[in-house]
């Protein structure tokens, strides 16, 4: 369903290699949308974190400063792997109080006042510095050739496999939810015994598959809280899969639906990979300057703007209110929905799960790319707009390595 197969730079050999062997191999720094003005009730703290997720960092900061976690603002989510530098906003604090903090895994690099709380999405993009180990001897030359193509034509704006969860099936759970197939949704949630680590976890899934619900509940490890909660409901009402699935946290249910959207989008990227840098009649084109979309009626007239990276074709993050393209591109997207057995109205779910949908550019610009070598391997530096993933670049550069 994800459709991630081909390379935009298929004619150029990759570097191979692996990433994230140490924290310093993967460094991400947010590019702010604006800088703190120097006055106001919020302190904008630039933090550097190692081996800590954004949400864990917020918990530690809130606890240390006696704040509610909800009061702490942030612009983007970052995972625990690697070194990340990002800004958080802290209300009713003095900069010197924040600078004095000493927390495991977190360094405070600066603290300045600003008037408003930092909101999700309030960033321009991210700058990456990534070391790839175990590459071929001419890796720098290979990487430079690939980066030059990506800089000219754009980076395929894939979500990639990291969007689909540890077992790679989050999007399938979302699809089952849209289809109202709650038995399938629960089966997928429980997982595949071949894809988990730990004998108890594996045995718990196998017990579920045999219909031994109480035994499965007993065997599931403590970190599998969602699975245990769902099975607890099934023990009481074995045929009520929809009711059992309601035990899943609403935020997690929304994540499954979002993963389904992402997989369908990635399928469109794959289908249109060869023409990512051109717009077709009926396309909904993306203006990179402001994120607005417009219907393309004269592709020849718009071609220079696409060539100069002012505009790009878009793909769907399907939803009940998403604008559909016309012509061949509209037919492609409608056929994709039909093949999955869903329609736009399927996304109009109750219980706060409604997905309105939006357009997303099929390609994004690659900012200031550089490739160099150090004693440990190949070093790649580049920037991407917010919402785009470094794995899309690494996949093209490494080709067959491990860009995760």
UniProtKB/Swiss-Prot annotation:
* Entry EC no(s): 5.4.99.27
From the record, what ranges are coiled-coil? Answer: none
Which biological process annotations from GO are given for this protein? tRNA pseudouridine synthesis
All copies of domain TRUD, residue ranges: 154-364
Keywords on record: Isomerase, tRNA processing
Give the record's GO CC terms: cytosol
Reactions listed under catalytic activity: uridine(13) in tRNA = pseudouridine(13) in tRNA
The active-site annotation reads 79 (nucleophile)
Note the PANTHER family from the entry: TRNA PSEUDOURIDINE SYNTHASE D
Question: HAMAP family from the entry?
Answer: TruD
> Which NCBIfam families does the record match to this protein?
tRNA_TruD_broad (TIGR00094)
Q: What does this protein do?
A: Responsible for synthesis of pseudouridine from uracil-13 in transfer RNAs.
Q: What is this protein called?
A: tRNA pseudouridine synthase D
In its UniProt entry, the species of origin is given as: Geobacter metallireducens (strain ATCC 53774 / DSM 7210 / GS-15)
Q: Which gene encodes it?
A: truD
């Amino acid at each position: 369903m994800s459709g991630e197969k081909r390379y935009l730079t298929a004619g150029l050999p990759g570097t191979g290699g692996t990433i994230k062997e140490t924290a310093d191999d993967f460094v991400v720094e947010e590019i702010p949308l604006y800088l703190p003005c120097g006055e106001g009730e919020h302190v904008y703290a630039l933090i550097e974190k190692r081996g800590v997720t954004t949400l864990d960092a917020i918990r530690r900061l809130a606890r240390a400063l006696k704040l509610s976690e909800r009061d702490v603002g942030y612009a983007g989510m970052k995972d625990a792997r690697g070194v990340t530098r990002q800004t958080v906003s802290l209300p009713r604090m003095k900069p010197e109080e924040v600078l004095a903090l000493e927390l495991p895994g977190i360094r405070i690099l600066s603290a300045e006042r600003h008037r408003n709380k930092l909101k999700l999405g309030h960033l321009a993009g991210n700058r990456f510095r990534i070391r790839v180990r175990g590459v071929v001897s001419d890796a720098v030359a290979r990487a430079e050739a690939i980066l030059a193509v990506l800089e000219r034509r754009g980076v395929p704006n894939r979500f990639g496999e990291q969007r689909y969860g540890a077992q790679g099936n989050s999007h399938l759970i979302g699809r089952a939810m849209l289809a109202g197939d709650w038995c399938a949704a629960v089966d997928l949630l429980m997982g595949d015994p071949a894809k988990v680590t730990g004998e108890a976890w594996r045995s718990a899934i196998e017990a579920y598959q045999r219909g031994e619900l109480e035994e499965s509940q007993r065997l599931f490890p403590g970190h599998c809280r969602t699975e245990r909660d769902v099975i607890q409901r099934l023990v009481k009402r074995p045929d009520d899969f929809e009711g059992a699935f309601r035990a899943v946290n609403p935020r997690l249910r929304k994540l499954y639906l979002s993963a389904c959207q992402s997989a369908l989008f990635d399928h469109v990227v794959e289908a249109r990979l060869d023409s990512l840098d051109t717009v077709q009649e009926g396309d909904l084109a993306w203006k990179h300057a402001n994120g607005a979309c417009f219907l393309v009626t004269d592709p020849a007239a718009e071609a220079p703007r696409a060539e100069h990276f002012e505009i790009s074709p878009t793909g769907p993050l399907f939803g009940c209110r998403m604008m559909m393209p016309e012509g061949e591109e509209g037919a492609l997207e409608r056929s994709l929905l039909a093949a999955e057995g869903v329609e736009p109205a399927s996304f109009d779910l109750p219980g706060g799960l409604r997905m309105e949908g939006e357009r997303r550019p099929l390609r994004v610009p690659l900012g200031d790319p550089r490739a160099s070598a150090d004693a440990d391997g190949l070093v790649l530096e580049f920037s991407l707009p917010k919402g785009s993933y470094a794995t899309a670049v690494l996949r093209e550069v490494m080709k067959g390595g491990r860009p995760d």
